[in-house]
């Protein structure tokens, strides 16, 4: 499909929906990016330990990550949770379709063993030096305040409301 055709394909249903209210459609993806692994597991975070392309268990993913980093010294274990959000907005049926992209990051260091139970995925192994604990050890309110998803969503809200 040509880009112009795709644009038309997306624009027309948006125009119909925007006759009553602005329409915002967003999609996101998140992952853990480890510097010593050249950004892996990245977009494959949920399937990192998978052998068949399906999602792997959190435990299997964490075990694979820690195994791959076993020989990496403490000073070289930097990583970030990253959330990318893309959104399209149509404020009125005759207006242009607006495109937005935001990114939120939560930088830290991969610990040598899992810690904490407040979370999922790689939360038990992303250590945040400024808090002295892994993400899974943070209280929910604190975790929500610093999360990569929260940062990306706040950027999107700022852009949306900042020009609305």
Question: What do the PLM-derived regions correspond to, one by one?
Answer:
Residues 1-164:
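Anionic-ligand binding patches
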């Amino acid at each position: 499909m040509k880009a112009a055709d795709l644009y038309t394909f997306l624009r027309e249903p948006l125009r119909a929906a925007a006759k009553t209210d602005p329409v915002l459609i967003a999609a996101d993806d998140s992952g853990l990016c480890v510097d010593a692994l050249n950004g892996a597991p990245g977009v494959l975070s949920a399937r990192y330990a998978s052998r068949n392309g399906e999602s792997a268990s959190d435990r299997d993913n964490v075990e694979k990550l820690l195994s791959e980093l076993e020989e990496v010294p403490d000073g070289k274990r930097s990583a970030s949770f990253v959330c990318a959000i893309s959104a399209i907005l149509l404020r009125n049926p005759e207006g242009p379709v607006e495109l937005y992209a935001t990114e939120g990051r939560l930088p830290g260091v991969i610990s040598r063993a899992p810690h904490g139970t407040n979370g999922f995925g790689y939360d038990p192994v992303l250590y945040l030096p400024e808090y002295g604990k892994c993400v899974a050890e943070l209280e929910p309110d604190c975790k929500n305040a610093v999360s990569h998803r929260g940062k990306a969503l706040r950027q999107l809200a700022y852009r949306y409301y900042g020009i609305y």
